[in-house]
Amino acid sequence: MFEATTILGYKGEYNGKKCAIIGGDGQVTFGNCVLKNNATKIRTLYNGEILSGFAGSTADAFSLFDMFERILEGRKGDLVRSVLEFSKEWRKDKYLRKLEAMMIVLNTEHIYILSGTGDVVEPEDGTIAAIGSGGNYALSAARALHNYASLPPREIVEHSLAIAGELCIYTNTNIKILEL
């Protein structure tokens, strides 16, 4: 189920201004068949202050989005507290523990991966996170471009997802991007 997409999140600073960017490809795969090539797997939450994206089962991901959005509203947009509460709820609920989806959530201050087991992972570098079947390709490309090229963050995300789309059969180059 996790072989259906690539999502890449980037949090950083450019020209003295903090930024957060998330991008994803548009491919939806069922077995060895591409069902759709222009799906949207990223969205804004909490009045456009939080970016999010998912990989995995679409129905499961929407359940997680709804739950996370409710918690985020209750915590008045506090991403750190919302992520921790979300993880606690996820682990307590037997139904949620069986969901086959992962999420990236970020703003200009924080970036997290929410795993299918309810784990919360903050990326080692605190800047770049990737999930999905092409996630490792996108992550590698993004780290290289971040460290060795002088590109704007949006271009880093675009180029990294394009590279993943060239290498991963479950990822395409129909890229959508959101930014704060």
Swiss-Prot record:
GO MF annotation list: metal ion binding; threonine-type endopeptidase activity
Catalysed conversion reaction: ATP-dependent cleavage of peptide bonds with broad specificity
Active site (UniProt): 5
Lineage: Bacteria, Pseudomonadati, Campylobacterota, Epsilonproteobacteria, Campylobacterales
Gene expressing this chain: hslV
GO biological process, one term: proteolysis involved in protein catabolic process
Family recorded in the similarity comment: Belongs to the peptidase T1B family. HslV subfamily.
InterPro entries: ATP-dep_Prtase_HsIV_su, Ntn_hydrolases_N, Proteasome_sua/b, Proteasome_suB-type
Entry protein name: ATP-dependent protease subunit HslV
UniProt entry keywords in alphabetical sequence: Allosteric enzyme, Cytoplasm, Hydrolase, Metal-binding, Protease, Sodium, Threonine protease
Description of how the protein assembles with itself and partners: A double ring-shaped homohexamer of HslV is capped on each side by a ring-shaped HslU homohexamer. The assembly of the HslU/HslV complex is dependent on binding of ATP.
